[in-house]
Amino acid sequence: SLNLLFADWANRGLNQWTIEEVSITLATGIRDYPGGTLTMTVGSSTSFSVGETLTGGTSAATASVTSKPSGTTLAITIPSGTFTSGETISGGTSGASSTLAAAVDLTNVQSTIDILSAVVTRDSTDFEIQRVSRSSFLNIPNKSQSGRPNQFFLNRQITPVLQIWPAPDNDTDIVKFNRLTRIDDVDAYTNTAEVPFR
């Protein structure tokens, strides 16, 4: 069927129209980021600190704050556990707390098939970061070393993780990457197929 054809195209790299650029603001000392956009909506994000660990009051799920895009939104790392809508989350260093407005949706990150290229932007200058293999990343002796990131590895789990090295040394660098995403599946005759005419 069409879904098998789409999977075959993705495997052969024929779905170039699904490439999109993603920008993630880096946080000091955090080296694992989602392979796409991942945010949580809370009552207020102003009292939380970038880099601190959030903990769910009832779920005990945890994630780190990578940036604060708005007064009610937190960009986060991939959670350990599952945050539940309506629970109170608290910050590990700031002591701030807020109510989670909706469950964290991993769909955007899980649609990532591959990361084709990446750069780190510092002071309006883009610096290329090199892709390394799983074994090369594993063999880095001191993964907590900090500096301007110059290598990345995409850990292709169900929810892909972008691992960078060295760990960022500030909260202002931005990683920009071109990711290849999954073609939206066809499940009803009323769907519009996510394919170009030519």
Residue ranges, per PLM feature:
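Autoprocessing Asn-cyclization modules and mimics
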Residues: 16-103
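Glycine-enriched, solvent-exposed interface loops adjoining structured elements
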Residues: 1-39, 99-198
